Amino acid sequence: MALTMLLLLVAAALTLIETRAGQHSLQYFHTAVSRPGLGEPWFISVGYVDDTQFVRFDSDAENPRMEPRARWMEQEGPEYWERETQIAKGHEQSFRGSLRTAQSYYNQSKGGSHTLQWMYGCDMGSDGRLLRGYLQFAYEGRDYIALNEDLKTWTAVDMAAQITRRKWEQAGIAEKDQAYLEGTCMQSLRRYLQLGKETLLRTDPPKAHVTHHPRSYGAVTLRCWALGFYPADITLTWQLNGEELTQDMELVETRPAGDGTFQKWASVVVPLGKEQNYTCHVNHEGLPEPLTLRWGRWEPPPYTVSNMATIAVVVDLGAVAIIGAVVAFVMNRR
């Protein structure tokens, strides 16, 4: 179960909402997992500003407290950490009841392991105003209920979620969430951007190169790498004689590199001997202009092709250790 959870947490963490140039986001991800016979459910909470994890709470820690995960958060005083710790512990307590409620909605036994997930946050536009707010809930890794874009109504995916929707409509939960997303969330985001401006407002351009991988039947794979960039928003495309190969291109999700930067690659399969007809195009806000690369016309970094695969695995495992967990949802908020 532990390995399954780690894979779940990394998969969700790697799908963080990316913001465009000039935009910023504050997001919180909570996860609660029941574990029969092993004590109380595991609860973990992480917060992100843009692509940077800045706070974390783990109920399995020796002394569970909200802790800084970015150096610039060490500027906050004891009152802040005590307040955030109490908030996290309040979520932990409510999720225990929520797990039991969810099991009853789906007529599940108490013997298995079950997962509640909740994600919420706000995006700031380049003008400093709220661009969008969002709040999503899931059970057993599947969508359950979500706040709509108007921040006033809910979308429930099944009959159990309809029960929750009716309860929340009667309790005016959407109005409270809207007030938080438009007010406190945006105020907090502005504060964190000020605290971490040297890190959060920087731009690190990608280091890019193309690798060559022979295949059978007279074909080769060209893989375009972008490494060491920040923020995470980047565009990689392959073109054949100036025309984009969107459908024929394999593109991986942007991955954290474990050092505060990101990596990504895109590949295409091409006929042997025709490699020079294909160009990779890299666009990132840290670049003065987009890069155009061909196989054999860019100085690769000191990594072998085999090492790159190893690096990708290590990066994902590092992301597990650093990120810890993703999303959480609440069925009943008390």
UniProtKB/Swiss-Prot annotation:
Intracellular or extracellular location(s): Membrane
Signal peptide: 1-21
Topological type in the membrane: Single-pass type I membrane protein
Biological processes annotated in GO: antigen processing and presentation of peptide antigen via MHC class I; cellular response to type II interferon; embryo implantation
Region (Alpha-2): 112-203
Any Pfam family the entry gives: C1-set
CDD domains per record: IgC1_MHC_Ib_Qa-2
Keyword tags: Disulfide bond, Glycoprotein, Immunity, Membrane, MHC I, Signal, Transmembrane, Transmembrane helix
Chain residue ranges for the region called Connecting peptide: 296-310
Its biological purpose: Involved in the presentation of foreign antigens to the immune system.
Name of the protein: H-2 class I histocompatibility antigen, Q7 alpha chain
Organism: Mus musculus (Mouse)
Lineage summary: Eukaryota, Metazoa, Chordata, Craniata, Vertebrata
Gene that this polypeptide is encoded by: H2-Q7
